[in-house]
């Protein structure tokens, strides 16, 4: 993802990020684990979703932030149509130019904290990986959740970092020895539940990336009040 770091990506920067980001053994393991969990989640949604998921291209998903399109193929392989969005224009451009299939509708650059350029309820789901641990102010997380609730008809699949002492210590040591100032936002489970509820969601499921070790969790949020008709 790229909305987090206040960094402007040009095309060479995107190419370099894509090449380097998941090159290490530990990061390849994380990437594989994330995708395994997400496939199980999507499989569960398809079973609950009925006929809509059975018709190829009937379900429309917003990937926000899309980054360079790391999850595009995974989402399209489940039969959904896909729209990619990110703060960085060249990230969106890269995600779209991969042309994973005709069901990859297109993309748009947007700052989710300020609003998405879409009509209410136009998407069935919003998919948001590796965004929320970069949103430090509570009001930013709440604003993004409200915006996701506005454009999603069914719900949201997103990741967040839940407070975990072991992972927090590991991050602290990494900053100490690598002299990096980059920090991530971990929130208590109760705080995440409150913020989700405030935006109109109930939490259906939360899956830890690595239970007891890693702070990242992947949550399935259901929009309260049932699904409405897509405009």
What is the predicted role of each segment?
Residues 1-49:
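Conserved class I S-adenosyl-L-methionine
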Residues 165-182:
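Short, glycine-/aromatic-enriched active-site segment of Class I SAM-dependent methyltransferases
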Residues 154-161:
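Conserved beta-strand signature within the Rossmann-like core of class I S-adenosyl-L-methionine
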Residues 142-154:
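A short glycine-rich, Lys/Arg-flanked "PGG" loop and its adjoining helix->strand segment in the class I
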Residues 183-199:
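Short alpha-helix
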Residues 127:
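A conserved beta-strand element that flanks and buttresses the S-adenosyl-L-methionine
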Residues 115-120:
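Short conserved loop adjoining the S-adenosyl-L-methionine
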Residues 62, 68-114:
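Class I SAM-dependent methyltransferase SAM/SAH-binding core
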